UniProtKB/Swiss-Prot annotation:
Chief location category: membrane
Induction profile: In roots by iron starvation.
Protein name: Fe(2+) transport protein 2
Cytoplasmic compartment residues: 69-80, 142-195, 249-257, 311-329
Organs and tissues of expression: Expressed in the external cell layers of the root subapical zone.
Annotated family: Belongs to the ZIP transporter (TC 2.A.5) family.
Range of residues in the leader sequence: 1-21
Keywords: Cell membrane, Ion transport, Iron, Iron transport, Membrane, Signal, Transmembrane, Transmembrane helix, Transport
Gene name for this UniProt entry: IRT2
Ranges per topology, Extracellular: 22-47, 102-120, 217-227, 279-289
Function: High-affinity iron transporter that mediates under iron-deficiency the iron uptake from the rhizosphere across the plasma membrane in the root epidermal layer. Could also be capable of transporting zinc ions.
GO CC aspect terms: plasma membrane
Regions annotated as coiled coil: none
UniProt subcellular location: Cell membrane
Organism: Arabidopsis thaliana (Mouse-ear cress)
Amino acid sequence: MATTKLVYILLILFTFTVSPAISTAPEHCDSGFDNPCINKAKALPLKIVAIVAILTTSLIGVTSPLFSRYISFLRPDGNGFMIVKCFSSGIILGTGFMHVLPDSFEMLSSKCLSDNPWHKFPFAGFVAMMSGLVTLAIDSITTSLYTGKNSVGPVPDEEYGIDQEKAIHMVGHNHSHGHGVVLATKDDGQLLRYQVIAMVLEVGILFHSVVIGLSLGATNDSCTIKGLIIALCFHHLFEGIGLGGCILQADFTNVKKFLMAFFFTGTTPCGIFLGIALSSIYRDNSPTALITIGLLNACSAGMLIYMALVDLLATEFMGSMLQGSIKLQIKCFTAALLGCAVMSVVAVWA
């Protein structure tokens, strides 16, 4: 997974360094210079406020689940934690459908792009679809590699007296018999799934966090920034809760927990700093910006939608905890709907 994350980061850095002359903007493209809200002097202090506010709310969001072990209502094995996790999963699903994917469609269908090929093919939907499939492949192959790396194949029940359905067999060293077999319960397999889910989810979130930060930092529209600050704070708070819950269940080492929380917390502010540095040469209606950010948004949307539906919501709703209680299912479904509703309301401003 570290290699996969590195590939994604390199891809992002590469796309932002592509030559600004990918294509030429049509003559009828609105430059936006007549907008009275365009004021660089007023926009800069607002961007600084945005950096501090988003940094703070992101930190609160992603770290709050990590301290839930000390709150009886929110312990990982309790109903309260499950309800909060489903709410956060709804937030992530709403982010993909109501924020990232619509932005991608809007950018890649802009009148600032040439008709051929951007208006003749739904690139946003196609890239989101392929991103979801690639995420599925990464999810599946990574799990297989990690599981297969430690598997030695089936062992007869009569030899070990253990139900194979409840154990996977891992190579170990037995001091009494030379090379022996160590058996791990299903909990180990579930822990591996949680770790894969947390890491893939973080990659998807980092994708669109970079885009959000760059766009906010590069714009000089003070009216837009004012509305975005509050909306993005709510967005990062709840998204952080969702990611933090996944990190908690993955039971990473403290160092890995810190690094994942650090990257989530700092990515958007770093994107804003980068946008500020590029604001003098960056035009959000240029073909290069529209194509690059539009494609990155589509890719991020596919990943977030897949993770929310398949690895988060479906996994929990098909699990033994929710399957054993219709009442808890209803509560969790309501929480997921509420999460989607919150992001739908936030979409009015962001």
